[in-house]
Amino acid sequence: MPNPAAGRFGRLAWLWLSLLVLVIDQATKLYFNNALTMYQQIVVIPDYFSWTLAYNTGAAFSFLADGAGWQRWLFALIAVVVSAVLVVWLKRLGRNETWLAVALALVLGGAIGNLYDRIVLGHVVDFILVHWQNRHYFPAFNVADSAITVGAVMLALDMFKSKKSEDPVHD
């Protein structure tokens, strides 16, 4: 049921943030795809942070990357469905739900950025590499992944905040 306090378009104005995430994501992927060769590393902060180029045909942490290609379309379908749900959710938000609107817009922008890669390129371009002393590496990721993660953390925090505010006060 639509939220009457949302107005006609709800919080769809926050789609500018999704577009900004998408543009920055695609611009950085294009830059690193052209500037680096596969798995080349440029150390930015020794022992902690590097630029690299990696292609991920799977999902997070290369989940199902060894599939025969069907996973590309499965993850694309999931991204399309999730994106549609996020737009509807964003539209139904009230004016006072800015935190949630930002969270949804970040997740949406990231999902569309990776969806574009998956459909057009057949893989997601990753280029950010965080590591500890060249021994312990976190899987490479990109701006879209970062936006999705920040948005998901914001959603979780919002759920905890909402749940806490609904708890009855005990004397």
UniProtKB/Swiss-Prot annotation:
Subcellular location: Cell inner membrane
Pfam family, one: Peptidase_A8
Major location category of this protein: membrane
UniProt key word Cell inner membrane: yes
Pathway membership, UniProt: Protein modification; lipoprotein biosynthesis (signal peptide cleavage)
Residue spans crossing the bilayer: 12-32, 42-62, 70-90, 96-116, 137-157
Database matches in PANTHER family: LIPOPROTEIN SIGNAL PEPTIDASE
Cited function: This protein specifically catalyzes the removal of signal peptides from prolipoproteins.
Protein name: Lipoprotein signal peptidase
Gene name of the record: lspA
